[in-house]
Regions:
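Auxiliary alpha/beta "docking" domains used to position bulky ligands
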Residues: 1-138
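Short, flexible active-site recognition loops that position polar ligands and cofactors
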Residues: 53, 57, 240-245
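Short, charged low-complexity linear segments at domain edges
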Residues: 110-134, 158-180, 230-234
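Iron-sulfur cluster-binding cysteine motifs and their immediate structural context
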Residues: 144-169, 185-213
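Short Fe-S-cluster ligation motifs
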Residues: 172-190, 221-243
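Long, compositionally biased charged/polar accessory segments in the mid-to-C-terminal portions
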Residues: 243-258
Length: 258
């Protein structure tokens, strides 16, 4: 029965264009873990690739809601909750347990088809579904990500988040001189793609889902936002992932990079 239910769920996910969907167990529950590829090509700009499309949280949540509704339709007494970014489990760990990828030296999860250019979402339900097993693939270990990191946050000994350009770009308040230099070196006002761009596993990464190839915006300039009130900023950019840390932070970063 649990294999049949699993097949129905995986087949349904495929029907709504989610091609990578597997099962992991978490605290006595089954997690239906899904990957959402977003790589739509490289283009000039000052925003990380993942922030080019409309806000992925909304897109993914809508897809996951369809899966949770489907689960409830085939198992009416079942509970099913959707999570994207914020949830009771580390999404990369769940995806690893579900056999959807392996860890790179940069800490990213790598899928054989998508590389590391994907978002992760999952549905926790109290069905007893057969879990998938982690895969045995390994990172090539070339060390290119170590060399490319603007802040030197990556090394054989681990990851230092305080030197990560992506973390710094989203850190509110006044930055230290060292943090400012790292941000300038990255060239981006929100996020960072340096370690992913040089990763050999991303060389043949599959293209994005349709939703992540539309309404693309690769950058903004200070003149775009400086005269806007916070409310106007929210109305204009509230449907973008880069807007969630607010206008003031983006202004600071834009001024630093000008």
């Amino acid at each position: 029965m649990k294999d049949l239910l699993k097949k129905k769920i995986i087949d349904f996910a495929a029907s709504i264009k989610i091609e990578k969907c597997s099962i992991a167990h978490y605290s006595g529950k089954s997690a239906v873990v899904c990957l959402f590829p977003y790589f739509s090509g490289y283009r000039e700009g000052n925003l990380s690739l993942y922030a080019h499309s409309l806000d992925y949280h909304k897109i993914i949540s809508e897809k996951l809601k369809l899966i949770s509704d489907f689960i409830k339709s085939i198992a009416p007494s079942c509970t099913a909750e959707c999570f994207c970014d914020i949830g009771p489990e580390v999404d990369r760990l769940l995806a690893y347990r579900a056999g959807l990828g392996f860890y790179g030296k940069n800490g990213m999860l790598i899928n054989s088809e998508y590389g590391s250019f994907f978002f992760i979402g999952y549905v926790l339900c109290d069905l007893n579904l057969t879990p998938d097993a982690p895969i045995e693939n390994e990172c090539m270990g070339c060390g290119k990500c170590f060399e490319a990191c603007p802040g030197g946050a990556l090394s054989a000994s681990g990851f230092d988040i305080s030197k990560c350009a992506s973390h710094i770009s989203q850190k509110k308040g006044t930055l230290t001189k060292e943090e400012e230099e790292i941000l300038k070196k990255s060239g981006l006002i929100f996020g960072c793609d340096a370690c992913q761009k040089v990763c050999p596993h991303n060389k043949e990464a599959c293209k994005a889902m349709k939703e992540f190839t539309e309404n693309l915006m690769s950058g903004i300039c200070l003149d775009d936002i400086k005269s806007l009130t916070n409310r106007q900023f929210s109305e204009k950019y509230g449907n973008r992932a880069f807007s969630w840390r607010g206008k003031k932070l983006l202004e600071r970063n834009l001024e630093l990079l000008s």
